[in-house]
C-alpha cells in the first residue's frame, strides 16, 4: 500500500474530525480540505483549498484532485452527495468514499426512504407521503395518534416538526407546503406516527456488501438544557450510549443495518460510504428507524472517531475497493467520549459573526477541539456560523469524559458563546436502587437460541445414521464402532483424519442468504481429502461460530452438513455452535469441519511406488468453482459492474451468486469401489492451487503430470471469470479447478474399467493427460491453454 493524497470536501466540525483522524494514518501523504475552516491551519500536512461544494464547483474540484494526484475523495456534507458529486470524481477515475446520487436519495428524500423501509420490512413508524396540501390536512384530521411532520427534502437538519396537537399539525403543513418554509424541500411531506423512547445514532461504514458499525451515540438536538427550545443541528453527543446494549445492537444489525445494506444493493444503488441511521428505541426495547443519512453525522463524528482504534484511511480505502471485510476493525471498547458544541449567542435564530475566537493551550490530555463555523481573517480565527466550535474528550468513564469535555469548553473564548450544560444527562438518569442483575443474554449470548437450534436440527442429524454410529447429538462427543462398520481386522485398519473450512465463499452465502450449500461444501472439502488417501469417511463434526446466533441461518447450514454426510456415507456425530459477541461482524459467521475415516493398509493411496511414465490421468468433472479461489472470484465480481443478484452471463436462468454457490461435488461413493479393487494408483482433489499444484501432491518426485486442456470443455463460468477479471491464464490455472474436481492416476490397462465404474456412478470422466519423466519439468505442465479466453 502506497501513501496517497486525500481530498475532504466540506467546512464543518465533522470534516475537521475526519481530517484529524485521517492525518493519523501512515498512508496519508497530504490532505486537502475544500473549502475548510479556521481550524485546519494547525494540522500538519493539511491544506485548505478555496473551492466550494455546490454543483457549479464540481468541475473545479475534479480538476484540482487530478492535478494534485488525489487518491481518495471524501465528501462530508449530504448536499454534494445528493447533487451527484461521486459520479464526477468516478468518471475521472478517482475513488470516492460516499454513495451515488441514487443511493443518496435515502437522505435526500424522506418519502423515498420511507417507501424503501416499507418494501424491505425495516421497522419504522407508520406513515403516509403527501404532495397535496388538502390530502395531508385530511390525514391529520383522521389520525388518532400523535404525529411528526417531515419535509421530504434536505432542510439543513430543521425540516422535522413535532406538533403538540392537531392545530399545530395543520399550521406545520401549511408552513411547509404552502408558505414554503423550507423551499422545495417541502414540496412533498411525510406525516408519520410519533414514536416515544430513546434515540440512538448508529454510524455504519459499508462497502455495499459488508459493514461495520461505530459505537452507538446519542445526540442533543434542542438548544436548551433539559431538551427544551428550538431544534438545532446538534448541541453535543456522547458515546457509547448505555442504552446500546449488546443485545440491542445485534437487533439493530440484524433487523435494520443488514436489510438496509442488502436492500440498497439489490435495488441497484449500493451504499458505499457511511450510512448514519437515526434509531428510536421504544419502551418495549424495539429499535425503529427514524431517518437515514448517507454521510457521517455532526456532532456524532466528533464523538465517535476518537474511539476508533483502526486506521480510518485504511478503512475507507477498503470500503471503496469493496473489501471492507479484509480490514481489522477495532474500537477503544474501554473508553467513553463526549462532545460539547459551543454556539454563537442567539443561535439557532439570528446571531453575530466575526467575533475573535481564542483557545487556551495546552488542552488537557485526550481533549480535542474541532472547528465548525469558523474562518481565518487577518491572521485571527473568527466566528462564521451558528455552531462555532466543539470540545471532545475521551476517558475511562462517561462521567469523566463529560467533565473533561466541559474543561475543554472552558478553554474556548469568544463573545456571547453559548453551550448546553447537561450533555449526556440521559445517561445519568437516576438508577434503580436495587442492583440490576446481568444475564448471559444481556452479554449477547442466548442459551435458549442454542437449545432451539439443537431441537431444530435433530431430525437432520439423525438422518445421517450409519452402521457404527447412531448420530445422536446433545452429549459431550461422538462414538464410533469400527467393527460394526465392517472393519473387523483392527490390526490392518488405519484411521485417517482431515480438517478444513469453506473460506470466503461464506461471504457470498451471507450476501445471498443461502446457507445450506456451504454446509455441503464443508463436508465435501473434508471427505474428498479422505478418499484421496483411499479412506472411507465414517464420521463428521462441524464447528459454527458467529457473533449472534440466527437460528434459521444455523439450521440451514447444519441441514447442508447433514446432506453432505449422507452423500458421502458418514455420520454427523457432533459439533460446536459458538456464539461470540464482538468477534464477528453482523451477519457474518465462520465454520470448520473435521472428518474421520478408515482404510485397510493395502488400500492406502497414493501408491507412488507403482507409478510410471505413461500412466493415465483421468479427470472427473466438477460442479463449478467449488470452494477455492473465492478471494479472486469475489474481487472480480465486486469490482466490476456486476452484482451477485444479476443473471449469470453464462446461465441467465440463474444469478451469479447462485452459480458460484453451487456446492463442491462429493466423490466418495463413486471412487471407493475402484480404489478398493486396486484400480486407482492415486487421486488428487483439485482445490486451492488448481491442477498445477494439486496433481503433483499425488505423484512421485521423478514424474511430472502432463495435462492437455483440449481434452475437456472448460465450463463457461471459468472463461467469464478470467476474461472479466483480466486474470492471466497462468494465474487462473493455479487458482481454480477449471472444470475438473478430481484427478485419478490409473494404469493404461485399467483405464477402460475405471471409466466404466465412474460413469455407472453418474460421473463425467475425461482422459486429460499422462505422467511423464520429470527431468527438468515442473510437477505439472498444462498444454494448449493459450486460447482459453
UniProtKB/Swiss-Prot annotation:
Keyword list, A-Z: ATP-binding, Cytoplasm, Ligase, Magnesium, Manganese, Metal-binding, Multifunctional enzyme, Nucleotide-binding, Purine biosynthesis
Entry cofactors: Mg(2+); Mn(2+)
Keyword Manganese carried by entry: yes
Subcellular location: Cytoplasm, Cytosol
A Pfam entry, by short name: AIRS
CDD domains in the cross-refs: PurM
GO CC annotations, alphabetized: cytosol
Residues given in the record as ATP binding sites: 140-201
Function: Catalyzes the second and fifth step in the 'de novo' purine biosynthesis pathway; contains phosphoribosylamine--glycine ligase (GARS) and phosphoribosylformylglycinamidine cyclo-ligase (AIRS) activities.
Protein name: Bifunctional purine biosynthetic protein PUR2,5
Amino acid at each position: 500500500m502506497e501513501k496517497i493524497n486525500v481530498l475532504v470536501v466540506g467546512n464543518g466540525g465533522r470534516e475537521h474530525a475526519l481530517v484529524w483522524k485521517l492525518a493519523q494514518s501512515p498512508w496519508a501523504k497530504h490532505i486537502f480540505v475544500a473549502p475548510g475552516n479556521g481550524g485546519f491551519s494547525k494540522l500538519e500536512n493539511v491544506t485548505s483549498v478555496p473551492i466550494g461544494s455546490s454543483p457549479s464547483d464540481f468541475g473545479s474540484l475534479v480538476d484540482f484532485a487530478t492535478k494534485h494526484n488525489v487518491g481518495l475523495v471524501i465528501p462530508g456534507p449530504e448536499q454534494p452527495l445528493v447533487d451527484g458529486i461521486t459520479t464526477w470524481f468516478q468518471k475521472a477515475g478517482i475513488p470516492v468514499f460516499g454513495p451515488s446520487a441514487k443511493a443518496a436519495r435515502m437522505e435526500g428524500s424522506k418519502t423515498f426512504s420511507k417507501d424503501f423501509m416499507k418494501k424491505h420490512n425495516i421497522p419504522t413508524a407508520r406513515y403516509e407521503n403527501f404532495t397535496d396540501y388538502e390530502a395531508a390536512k385530511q390525514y391529520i384530521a383522521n389520525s388518532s395518534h400523535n404525529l411528526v411532520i417531515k419535509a421530504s427534502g434536505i432542510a439543513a437538519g430543521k425540516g422535522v416538526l413535532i406538533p403538540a396537537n392537531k392545530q399545530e399539525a395543520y399550521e406545520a403543513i401549511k408552513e411547509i407546503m404552502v408558505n414554503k418554509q423550507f423551499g422545495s424541500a417541502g414540496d412533498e411531506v411525510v406525516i408519520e406516527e410519533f414514536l416515544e423512547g430513546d434515540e440512538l445514532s448508529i454510524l455504519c461504514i459499508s462497502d455495499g456488501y459488508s459493514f461495520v458499525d461505530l459505537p452507538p451515540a446519542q445526540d442533543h438536538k434542542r438548544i436548551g438544557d433539559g431538551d427544551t427550545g428550538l431544534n438545532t443541528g446538534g448541541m453535543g453527543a456522547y458515546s457509547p450510549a448505555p442504552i446500546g446494549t449488546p443485545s440491542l445492537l445485534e437487533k439493530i444489525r440484524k433487523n435494520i443495518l443488514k436489510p438496509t445494506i442488502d436492500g440498497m444493493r439489490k435495488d441497484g444503488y449500493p451504499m458505499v460510504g457511511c450510512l448514519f441511521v437515526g434509531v428510536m428505541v421504544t419502551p418495549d426495547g424495539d429499535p425503529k428507524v427514524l431517518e437515514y443519512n448517507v454521510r457521517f453525522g455532526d456532532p456524532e463524528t466528533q464523538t465517535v472517531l476518537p474511539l476508533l482504534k483502526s486506521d480510518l484511511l485504511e478503512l475507507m480505502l477498503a470500503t471503496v475497493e469493496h473489501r471492507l471485510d479484509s480490514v481489522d476493525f477495532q474500537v477503544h471498547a474501554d473508553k467513553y467520549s463526549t462532545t460539547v458544541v459551543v454556539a454563537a449567542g442567539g443561535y439557532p435564530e439570528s446571531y453575530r459573526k466575526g467575533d475573535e475566537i481564542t483557545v487556551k493551550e495546552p488542552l488537557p490530555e485526550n481533549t480535542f477541539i474541532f472547528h465548525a463555523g469558523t474562518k481565518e481573517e487577518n491572521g485571527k480565527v473568527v466566528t462564521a456560523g451558528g455552531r462555532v466550535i466543539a470540545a471532545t474528550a475521551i476517558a475511562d468513564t462517561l462521567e469523566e469524559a463529560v467533565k473533561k469535555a466541559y474543561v475543554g469548553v472552558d478553554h474556548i473564548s469568544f463573545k456571547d458563546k453559548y453551550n448546553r450544560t447537561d450533555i449526556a444527562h440521559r445517561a445519568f438518569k437516576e438508577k434503580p436502587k436495587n442492583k440490576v442483575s446481568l444475564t448471559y443474554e444481556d452479554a449477547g449470548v442466548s442459551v435458549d437460541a442454542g437449545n432451539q437450534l439443537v431441537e431444530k436440527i435433530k431430525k437432520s442429524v439423525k438422518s445421517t445414521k450409519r452402521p457404527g454410529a447412531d448420530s445422536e447429538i446433545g452429549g459431550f462427543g461422538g462414538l464410533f464402532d469400527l467393527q460394526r462398520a465392517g472393519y473387523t481386522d483392527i490390526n490392518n485398519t488405519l484411521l485417517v483424519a482431515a480438517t478444513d473450512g469453506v473460506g470466503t465463499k461464506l461471504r457470498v452465502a451471507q450476501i445471498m442468504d443461502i446457507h445450506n450449500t456451504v454446509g455441503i461444501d464443508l463436508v465435501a472439502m473434508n471427505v474428498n481429502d479422505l478418499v484421496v488417501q483411499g479412506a472411507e469417511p465414517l464420521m463428521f463434526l462441524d464447528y459454527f461460530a458467529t457473533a449472534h446466533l440466527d437460528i434459521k441461518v444455523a439450521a440451514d447450514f447444519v441441514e447442508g452438513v447433514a446432506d453432505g454426510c449422507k452423500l458421502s456415507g458418514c455420520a454427523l456425530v457432533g459439533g460446536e455452535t459458538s456464539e461470540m459477541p464482538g468477534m464477528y461482524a453482523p451477519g457474518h459467521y465462520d465454520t470448520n469441519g473435521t472428518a474421520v475415516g478408515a482404510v485397510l493398509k493395502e488400500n492406502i493411496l497414493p501408491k507412488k511406488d507403482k507409478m510410471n511414465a505413461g500412466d493415465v490421468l483421468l479427470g472427473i468433472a466438477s460442479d463449478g468453482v467449488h470452494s477455492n479461489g473465492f478471494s479472486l472470484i469475489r474481487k472480480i465480481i465486486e469490482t466490476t459492474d456486476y452484482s451477485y443478484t444479476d443473471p449469470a452471463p453464462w446461465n441467465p436462468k440463474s444469478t451469479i451468486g447462485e452459480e458460484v454457490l453451487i456446492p463442491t461435488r462429493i466423490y466418495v461413493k463413486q471412487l471407493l469401489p475402484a480404489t478398493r479393487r486396486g484400480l486407482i494408483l492415486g487421486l488428487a482433489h483439485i482445490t486451492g492451487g488448481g491442477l498445477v499444484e494439486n496433481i503433483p501432491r499425488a505423484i512421485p518426485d521423478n514424474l511430472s503430470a502432463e495435462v492437455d486442456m483440449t481434452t475437456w470443455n472448460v465450463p463457461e463460468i471459468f472463461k467469464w471469470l478470467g476474461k472479466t477479471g483480466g486474470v492471466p491464464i497462468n494465474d487462473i490455472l493455479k487458482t481454480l479447478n477449471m472444470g475438473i474436481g478430481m484427478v485419478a492416476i490409473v494404469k493404461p490397462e485399467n483405464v477402460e474399467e475405471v471409466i466404466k465404474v465412474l460413469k455407472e456412478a453418474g460421473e463425467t470422466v475425461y482422459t486429460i493427460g499422462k505422467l511423464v519423466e520429470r527431468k527438468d519439468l515442473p510437477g505439472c505442465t498444462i498444454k494448449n491453454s493459450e486460447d482459453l479466453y
